[in-house]
């Protein structure tokens, strides 16, 4: 009886490993130069069970400036009730304000990139996600740090860390006037 139980346990363990490897995924690649279009396309994909995978901004293979987003979906268990917001601006003050408004509504950070705007600036673009299920959204406090000096950024990151903020990402943005800034995004979630 013990040998039979051990053999059955090994067989179940082996078959569960096979199930993991046989999972299938579907993908949607979204590409556009307009943030409003990207947000609409991401939410349309979310309605079909896709979730955010990754983002990149830059020059496409045909020479245009675009933001590329990969949306992913498990064929067996598609996601449901996700909503996305895409923020993009070359003004850090505006970005901080919009980011905090989204945090107040429970939107969580997914990713960020930089892409060139029609006005010659390099806009920081941030993608946020919120689960639309019945659970109340938790408030998230965001902090945006921006400086042209890396030594200043390190000092500000340490101060934010001491205040309980978790680092999420960093990019170098360029304003329409030609200035470059190191921009870090951090968050603190209310308990």
Language model segments and positions:
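Bacterial N-terminal signal peptides that target proteins for export
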Residues: 1-7
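Terminus-proximal functional modules
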Residues: 18-191
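Bacterial N-terminal signal peptides
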Residues: 7-16
């Amino acid at each position: 009886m013990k040998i039979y139980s051990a053999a059955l346990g090994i067989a179940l363990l082996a078959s569960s490993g096979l199930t993991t490897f046989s999972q299938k995924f579907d993908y949607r690649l979204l590409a556009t130069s307009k943030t409003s279009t990207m947000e609409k396309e991401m939410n349309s994909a979310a309605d079909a069970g896709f979730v955010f995978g990754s983002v990149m901004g830059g020059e496409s293979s045909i020479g245009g400036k675009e933001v590329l987003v990969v949306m992913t979906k498990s064929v067996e268990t598609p996601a449901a009730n996700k909503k996305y917001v895409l923020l993009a601006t070359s003004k850090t003050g505006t970005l901080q304000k919009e980011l905090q408004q989204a945090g107040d509504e429970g939107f969580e950070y997914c990713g960020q990139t930089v892409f060139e705007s029609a006005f010659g600036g390099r806009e920081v673009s941030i993608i946020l996600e919120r689960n639309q299920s019945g659970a109340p959204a938790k408030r998230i406090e965001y902090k945006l740090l921006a400086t042209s000096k890396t030594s200043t950024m390190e000092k500000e990151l340490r101060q934010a860390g001491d205040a309980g903020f978790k680092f999420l990402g960093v990019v170098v943005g360029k304003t329409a006037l030609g200035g470059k800034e190191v921009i870090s995004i951090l968050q603190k979630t209310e308990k």
